[in-house]
Amino acid sequence: MIARVNNVTITTILIILNFIILVHGASKVPCYFIFGDSLLDNGNNNNLNTEAKANYPPYGIDFPNGPTGRFTNGRNMADILGHFLFLIFRLIYFDSWELLGFDDYIPPFASAIGREILQGVNYASGSAGIRNETGSHLGNRIFLDLQLQNHHNTILRMVDLVGNRVATNAHLNTCLYIVGIGSNDYINNYLVPKRYSTNSLYTPSQYATLLVQQYAQQLKVQH
C-alpha cells in the first residue's frame, strides 16, 4: 500500500514538474478553472436545496474563516494543488505567487463577481456527476454539463471585461484547468439501484465505458 501511495506521489510530482518545464520562460499562468464534485467544491452548494452541503461545523474547523462550503476540515484538493504549485514555483522563481497570478483562493461560481473571474472560477458541486441524473436523490446539484455551461457564461462575461473575443481566448489559452469528477456516478447512482436504473440497464463494464465516452465528449466541449 505504501509503495502504491509513493508511486502516485512520484507520478503527481513528475506531472507538475513537466508543467513547470512547459511554462518556464513563458508568461505567468493568469487563471485557474476548477470543475468537479465535493472533492473540489468550495461553496457552490451553499444556497442550493440539497443535502450535500458543507457550510456548517465541523466542516471548515481548520479553515481561517470557518465553514465555507468545502467538504473538508480545511483546504480541499484544488486549494492544495494551487498551494503546491506555489511552493514549487517559489523554489525555482522565488516569486511564484506572482508568477502563477493567484493572490487569493479561487472564488466559487455562485459568488464570483466583477474582474475576479479573470483569475479563475470554481464550478465544482457536491454530489455532481458526469451523468446529469447522478446525485438527484440528494437534491439540487450542478452536474458537469451545467458546470460547462456556467463556464461558457463566464467566458461571455470575460469578453465584456477584456473587450474582445481574441484577447479573451489568448487569456484562456494560458490558464490552468482541473477536473475531478466521476465517483458520484457510482456511489450516488450505479450503486443505488432503488433510486436509479443504471444498475439494471448496464453491466459494470458497460457502465464504465458509457461514463468514459460521455466524459470524453464533455472534455471536448470544455476544450
Q: Which residues fall in each region the model found?
A:
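Conserved active-site regions of diverse hydrolases
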Residues: I2-H223
